[in-house]
Amino acid sequence: MQLLTIGINHHTAPVALRERVAFPLEQIKPALVTFKNVFLGPQAPNAPEAAILSTCNRTELYCATDDRAARDAAIRWLSDYHRIPVDELAPHVYALPQSEAVRHAFRVASGLDSMVLGETQILGQMKDAVRTASEAGALGTYLNQLFQRTFAVAKEVRGTTEIGAQSVSMAAAAVRLAQRIFEKVSDQRVLFIGAGEMIELCATHFAAQGPRELVVANRTAERGQRLAERFNGRAMPLSDLPARMQEFDIIVSCTASTLPIIGLGAVERAVKARRHRPIFMVDLAVPRDIEPEVSKLKDVFLYTVDDLGAIVREGNASRQAAVAQAEAIIETRVQNFMQWLDTRSVVPVIRHMHTQADALRRLEVEKAQKMLARGDDPAAVLEALSQALTNKLIHGPTSALNRVNGADRDSLIELMRGFYQHAPRSNDQSGH
């Protein structure tokens, strides 16, 4: 079985492409079924394994397969599933086999590959991805072991390095940008659209600035109300957004919608109603919640996750010593995992050897039983049984020795000597 990771992320693709390749949560289980049955094939010698990790910053397919053409087939599957031409998608895709796939998984879970260096949210997202794959019946020995090791490595990295210390989060970056637009965030009305973890983080940071008003709009009213109450804010129905958008100076959106929920026309009307007072908008969703054309409006300052990346990277530069320490830990753990993987590669061979040897044993025992049944001398039967088993068991090695030449033969001879140098001694020879 070969490990392979196929994906795109914030390093390789802009948000405009990432949002087209993202998997909504409800699509992941059925996607895994097609990925296994159509791409990897139901007739594979070993059952294929797969998991899909889809976040704002990355979409990745982790798989274990016997298919030697897995790389190209995976890219084609991803292209077909999302109806994106291969020529458009392929330049942004990375394909990581074996140890590279292992190293990547360890780095992602440890926060080393995140836009926010050392952030912890990705670890929870990865655990959710593994849970979903398990529920879909898509995991097996190889990926289960990979992800168990991955989570252990992430815990070790975060527990022994300062990789997460003083990190500049996306939420903190959003506040910093708002402070560039408005002299005082405390004078502004802030609207949060959504009620997930990212919005909760943003609300925490903005609430610390003491805004004039804090409002949460969410599709599920009860969840939005709970979040608003935590920050002494108010909740409003998401359906009220078009009519009330002009009330807010700062709008932060991060929902799971597959289509934009804020269109150009609605923002144009809001700007006009505000008499061209500026609106600061942050779209942290992938796919995006706000139509990108909104950024062209004169009095609107629209930022996406990619735009916030520059501010985040400023904070990342100061923690390179922790990065080096984390990378060293990861490299050691990658080598450990590859040793385990190497031992797994011989398991099918050992299993086959046992099966073949047992088939020979049963065949010769059956012959011996027939000989005994017709009254043959038991000692002669045992001798015939042992001779037949000996001849059959050494037939494969002797045939191999006769077939090979040169250096290969010398190596095989040394190998065989090692196998048979500790031949058991008979009872008579041992003196018992």
UniProtKB/Swiss-Prot annotation:
Pathway note? Porphyrin-containing compound metabolism; protoporphyrin-IX biosynthesis; 5-aminolevulinate from L-glutamyl-tRNA(Glu): step 1/2
Residues annotated as site: Important for activity: H104
- Provide the binding site for NADP(+): G194, A195, G196, E197, M198, I199
Task: Please verify whether the record's keywords include Oxidoreductase.
Answer: yes
Answer yes or no on keyword Oxidoreductase: yes
EC annotation? Answer: 1.2.1.70
Q: Which residues bind substrate?
A: T55, C56, N57, R58, S114, E119, T120, Q121, Q125
Q: Which PROSITE patterns match?
A: GLUTR
Which reaction equations make up its catalytic activity? Answer: (S)-4-amino-5-oxopentanoate + tRNA(Glu) + NADP(+) = L-glutamyl-tRNA(Glu) + NADPH + H(+)
Look at the named UniProt entry and state the broad enzyme category this protein falls under. oxidoreductase
Which residues does the entry assign to the active site, renumbered to this chain? C56
Task: Please describe the quaternary structure of this protein.
Answer: Homodimer.
What's this protein's family per the entry? Answer: Belongs to the glutamyl-tRNA reductase family.
The record's listing under PANTHER family reads: GLUTAMYL-TRNA REDUCTASE (PTHR43013:SF1)
Describe the function of this protein.
Answer: Catalyzes the NADPH-dependent reduction of glutamyl-tRNA(Glu) to glutamate 1-semialdehyde (GSA).
Question: What does the record say about domains?
Answer: Possesses an unusual extended V-shaped dimeric structure with each monomer consisting of three distinct domains arranged along a curved 'spinal' alpha-helix. The N-terminal catalytic domain specifically recognizes the glutamate moiety of the substrate. The second domain is the NADPH-binding domain, and the third C-terminal domain is responsible for dimerization.
Share any extra remarks.
During catalysis, the active site Cys acts as a nucleophile attacking the alpha-carbonyl group of tRNA-bound glutamate with the formation of a thioester intermediate between enzyme and glutamate, and the concomitant release of tRNA(Glu). The thioester intermediate is finally reduced by direct hydride transfer from NADPH, to form the product GSA.
Indicate what this protein is called per its UniProt record. Glutamyl-tRNA reductase
UniProt gene name = hemA
